[in-house]
Design a protein with these regions (language model features):
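Long, highly hydrophobic alpha-helical transmembrane signal-anchor segments
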Residues: 1-53, 125, 133
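Alpha-helical transmembrane segments and their immediate juxtamembrane interface regions
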Residues: 2-7, 117-155
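Loop-to-transmembrane-helix entry motif
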Residues: 8, 12, 90-101
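Alpha-helical transmembrane segments of multipass membrane proteins
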Residues: 18, 50-54, 101, 105, ...
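Alpha-helical transmembrane segments and their membrane-interface junctions
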Residues: 20-25, 44-45, 94-116
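Transmembrane helix-loop junctions in multipass membrane proteins, especially transporters and channels
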Residues: 26-30, 63-67, 114-118, 153-154
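Membrane-water interface of transmembrane alpha-helices
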Residues: 53-73
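Short membrane-interface loop/juxtamembrane segments of multi-pass integral membrane proteins
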Residues: 73-91
Length: 155
């Protein structure tokens, strides 16, 4: 169960930092000049690179300490038949929750500009809204996998 929680938390942090880097680079730090487009990176990009290195090293250390953890398979690593069944159950739950979340996010994304602009006069950046919505969908997928795996394991 430790490897599932480790992977879920690690992947969640990875996705959230990656989304923050995308927003930082393409929205807040882009400059359009006559010479072309110029991108600069900031502190979030540095934090992301440091986290990526630390997470990869942590995964490598875990694969050396826990023989049932495969670096290539990650959270799908299984020591026995019970863990394979848990992974299968969690994959089904994760798939269903991700698909439902995608439909909800698509609905929000399509109607967000029309719903908020006229009554509230709020100008939203659709790129940022899209990145945030799809990041949330991915996080829901990771969380639902971890919760379903732990639920199945403790049942």
């Amino acid at each position: 169960m430790k490897k599932i929680i480790f992977e879920a938390i690690g992947n969640l942090i990875f996705v959230l930092l990656f989304a923050a880097v995308i927003i930082e680079v393409f929205v807040t730090n882009v400059k359009y000049t006559t010479d072309g487009t110029q991108f600069t990176t900031g502190t979030i990009s540095s934090i992301f690179l440091i986290y990526l290195i630390v997470f990869l090293i942590s995964r490598l250390v875990l694969s050396k300490k826990d023989k049932s953890y495969s670096l290539k398979q990650g959270e799908f690593s299984a020591a026995d038949e019970r863990e394979k069944n848990n992974a299968y159950f969690a994959s089904i739950v994760s798939y269903k929750s991700t698909i439902i979340s995608l439909f909800i996010a698509l609905g929000i994304f399509v109607f967000i500009n029309n719903l908020l602009n006229p009554p509230f006069d709020i100008e939203l950046n659709l790129f940022v809204s899209g990145v945030v919505l799809f990041t949330l969908v991915i996080c829901i997928g990771f969380l639902s996998y971890a919760i379903a795996w732990v639920f199945q394991d403790t049942r």
